[in-house]
């Protein structure tokens, strides 16, 4: 199935089709660790049992973050809140989170580190009282060196066809709605790869109403130290 045909499906259909079709191409050694805090365990420190707490001095903090596809909700923060090291103090704090426009099916966000770096971990964090807590996205990466590389794939372009590699898919909906969701993407061999760019293909968690877009509080990228 091509990306263009997926794009013609409904938002929920797109999410399911993309996850099912592309999951098979994810690297066999990739590990996706999912954790969730609810009740009193959900604090502004975002401390999880199995996922590292957010960091302030990570590679993402210095990256250029660009919204490629979709629109951010005007009630929330822009893409800069994903890497500013500042966390919401409570659930449902719109301006402290990035999320796509109400009723939309998601979109794409790119990180550019300026040069190739060795990436060890990609960690993402979200917090909401309902369907805006789970995380659903596809993570791609590229060093930008492949012939025909497209740094800005639009909604009808499959990143795999223009120099991007699918790293993995993330779907934390089985953990339940509400609370804090933490995700840590690692590799069994220690390094996810040497890349200049990361591309996040975010998908709405549900389409039963207009409130299915995740409140992303922070995304960290941990690189190998020189």
Model-derived features with residue positions:
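Sec/Tat signal peptide C-region and signal peptidase I cleavage site
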Residues: 22-28
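Predominantly extracellular/luminal regions of secreted and cell-surface proteins
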Residues: 35-88
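Bacterial N-terminal signal peptides that target proteins for export
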Residues: 2-15
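Short beta-strands within extracellular/lumenal beta-sheet-rich domains
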Residues: 98-116
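Trp- and acidic/polar-enriched beta-sheet ligand-binding modules for extracellular glycan
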Residues: 29-53, 58, 103-107, 129-226
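Surface-exposed, low-complexity/disordered Ser/Thr/Gly/Pro/Asn-rich loops and linkers
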Residues: 79-104
């Amino acid at each position: 199935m091509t990306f263009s045909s997926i794009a013609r499906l409904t938002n929920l259909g797109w999410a399911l089709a993309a996850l099912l079709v592309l999951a098979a191409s994810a690297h066999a050694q990739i590990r996706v660790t999912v954790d969730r805090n609810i009740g009193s365990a959900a604090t502004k420190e975002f401390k999880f049992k199995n996922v590292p707490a957010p960091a302030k001095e990570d590679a993402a903090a210095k990256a250029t973050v660009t919204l490629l596809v979709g629109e951010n909700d005007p009630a929330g923060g822009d893409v800069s809140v994903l890497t500013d090291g500042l966390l919401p103090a409570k659930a449902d704090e719109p301006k402290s989170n990035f999320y796509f426009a109400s009723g939309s099916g998601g979109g794409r966000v790119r990180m550019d580190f300026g040069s190739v770096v060795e990436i060890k971990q990609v960690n993402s964090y979200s917090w909401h009282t309902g369907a805006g807590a789970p995380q659903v996205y596809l993570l791609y990466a590229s060093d930008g060196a492949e012939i025909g590389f497209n740094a800005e794939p639009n909604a009808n372009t499959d990143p795999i066809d223009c120099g991007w590699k699918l790293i993995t898919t993330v779907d934390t909906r089985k953990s339940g709605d509400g609370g804090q969701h933490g995700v840590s993407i690692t590799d069994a061999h220690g390094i996810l790869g040497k890349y200049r760019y990361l591309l996040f293909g975010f998908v709405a968690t549900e389409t039963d109403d207009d409130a299915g877009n995740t409140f992303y509080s922070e995304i960290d990228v941990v690189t190998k130290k020189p």
